[in-house]
Design a protein with these regions (language model features):
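Charged, amphipathic alpha-helical stretches
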Residues: 1-124
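Generic structural signal of hydrophobic/aromatic residues within well-ordered alpha-helices
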Residues: 25, 39-43, 64, 87, ...
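Generic recognition of cysteine residues
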Residues: 40, 149, 163, 211, ...
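Extended, Lys/Arg-rich, non-catalytic nucleic-acid recognition/anchoring regions
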Residues: 110, 117-216
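Eukaryotic partner-binding/assembly regions in large regulatory complexes
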Residues: 169-170, 174-177, 182-429
Length: 535
């Protein structure tokens, strides 16, 4: 299978040459990156100033003309570190042994400076500061238990998004800096913003998948939509219109957060101590740009689906907190889909048909041994597909098939990573123990309905199942389990016609089902929406 990369040819990169999972999927997914950090990193790219060659842009995505002309040039973006903001919000809740003397002293200085700016009775200033600190701590999104600078906020506003910053404790012990200012005399000596430990590159990868998808010929998109029976709307089939709708959706998402939060975060990070932000975010009086990674060019179809599904969530009328959690769930599901589909594509020499795999979904308390066995077998076959794809990707290359490299690839970005994220999403149970199998949670179901059912609309239950199968490879009923058995290469089993009755019950309990008769039901969109290219 052709293994070209986007947005530039990465074959000379050390990560590409040394890691088969990165060669297969892009740079990079990692089991160290939580689902919230995956979303935060993606939105950090969205909100940062970006440039392609000499062309800078501040929109969420490149203008369509720039996208079309984009050829063999890295994407660069200028993320902010927001160390003052993280220090103010997270230091008091961090481990005592992680609080270096310079951190504590600068925290005290920030508090003193903030008190000078507060216009209330002096006796109340300490309480006001504590209230503001607790308010920002309440937006903690990921990294609880880590050093304060490696933690992240919920991505509710642009001013709460920050790049990864790693405190280099070994360097601090060795050189013993005695002031906050000393920490920035040599870039990267005490704080690393380029280590990619927790912001491992997964968010960059998904952003690039969408950009790559928007570059595709509309005729190729339309042919794929028809062949795979995806049933996109006419607007969704035009990359330019879909891109414009995504821009509006992202703008609406960030405008939903109260302006007070943005203003408070900017004030604490930049106004109390402008020097720190200047040292971390600027280089020679210009924004400090960093290079994003790359994705596999063949994954444009997954990227296009992600763009459509994101757009439907952003234009569905959800409040900002629900939008964050829906997007987090979507990103987990998409990552799983990307791992399976790209692996299937690899093993079929690029000829895999959508969906390329099947997930046999059970009810969580399923007692039928046959249904549980098929679900378990579908999970094991998916794991095997990813396992084999990584190994086949090493064949015919100059990479030595080192067992250590393969084990790391399996754990960090391969089938073990797939299983870990699937369990984290609630798509696979039990979290521990044998006979793991696929199930649905109410949260996953609502995300599926939101991204499949037209806004302010409804579709038949049968159509709903067909579209889930087409877009996600998930099957629930006798016909779907039959297709799964065919994919598994095992004898088809005969099941009762009410195998999927539990799904109807789950939809009804969520208020998403309207019964027209005993044989016909409609699945309803859960929210009232406006704008967007949904259908």
């Amino acid at each position: 299978m052709s293994n070209s990369t986007f947005p530039y040819d990465a074959k000379s990169e050390q990560a590409y040459k040394s890691n088969p999972a990165i060669r297969l999927f892009g740079n990079r997914f990692s089991n160290d990156q939580t689902s919230m950090e995956l979303l935060c990193e993606f939105l950090l790219v969205i909100t940062s100033k970006k440039r392609i060659d000499d062309a800078e842009y501040a929109t969420a995505f490149p203008p369509i003309t720039l996208l079309i002309d984009w050829n063999n040039v890295e994407l660069e973006y200028a993320p902010k570190a927001r160390l003052n903001l993280k220090l103010f919000a997270f230091l008091s809740a961090s481990r005592l042994d992680s609080r270096h003397l310079t951190h504590r002293e600068h925290y005290t200085q920030l508090i003193q400076e903030l008190k000078k700016r507060i216009k209330v009775d002096s006796n109340d200033k300490t309480q006001v500061v504590k209230t503001l600190e607790n308010l920002l701590l309440g937006f903690q999104g990921a990294g609880s238990g880590r050093t304060w600078c490696t933690q992240s906020f919920l991505p509710l506003s642009k001013s709460l998004l920050a790049c990864e910053a790693i405190w280099k404790e070994t360097s601090a012990r060795r050189f013993n800096p005695n002031s906050w200012g000393n920490l920035f005399e040599t870039r990267g000596k005490y704080f690393s913003t380029s280590q990619h430990a927790f912001y491992a590159g997964g968010g960059e990868l998904l952003y690039l998948q969408i950009c790559n998808a928007m570059k595709q010929n509309p005729e190729a998109i339309q042919a794929w939509n028809l062949d795979a029976k995806l049933e996109f709307s006419s607007e969704e089939l035009e990359p330019g219109k879909l891109l414009n709708s995504l821009e509006r959706g992202m703008a609406k998402f960030f405008s939903a957060c109260p302006k007070f939060i943005d203003d408070l975060a900017e004030f604490i990070d930049d106004k109390l101590d402008p020097e720190t932000a200047a040292k971390t975010d600027m280089h020679e009086q210009q924004p400090r740009f960093v290079e994003a990674g790359w994705c596999n060019s063949a994954t444009w179809q997954e990227g296009y689906l992600l763009a459509v599904e994101m757009n439907r969530i952003l234009s569905s009328g959800l409040d900002v907190m629900d939008s964050v959690y829906y997007l987090e769930t979507l990103f987990m599901l998409h990552t799983l889909r990307n791992l399976i589909m790209q692996s299937s594509r690899c093993l079929s020499n690029g000829e895999a048909k959508w969906p390329g795999y099947y997930m046999a979904i059970n009810r969580s308390d399923e007692e039928n041994g046959t249904l549980k066995r098929i679900s378990h077998q579908s999970l094991k076959n998916i794991e095997k597909t990813i396992y084999m794809a990584i190994r086949s990707h090493m064949q015919g290359t100059d990479i030595v098939q080192d067992e250590k490299i393969l084990k790391e690839a399996d754990t960090r970005s391969g089938h073990k990573f797939f299983l870990k994220m699937a369990k984290q999403a609630g798509l696979v149970i039990p979290k521990r123990g044998a006979w793991a199998r696929f199930v649905l949670t109410p949260q996953i179901l609502r995300v599926l309905v939101t991204t499949i059912v037209p806004q302010q609309g409804r579709i038949t239950y049968e159509t709903f199942k067909q579209l889930i199968r087409a877009r996600w490879g998930m099957v629930f009923d006798e016909a779907g389990f039959g297709k799964c058995c065919e994919w598994l290469g095992v004898e088809k089993v005969y099941l009762s016609s009410d195998t999927d009755a539990w799904l109807l019950e789950m939809l009804a309990e969520s208020g998403l089902l309207m019964h027209l008769s005993d044989s016909c039901a409609l699945v309803l969109h859960p929210n009232q929406g406006n704008d967007g290219a949904g259908s």
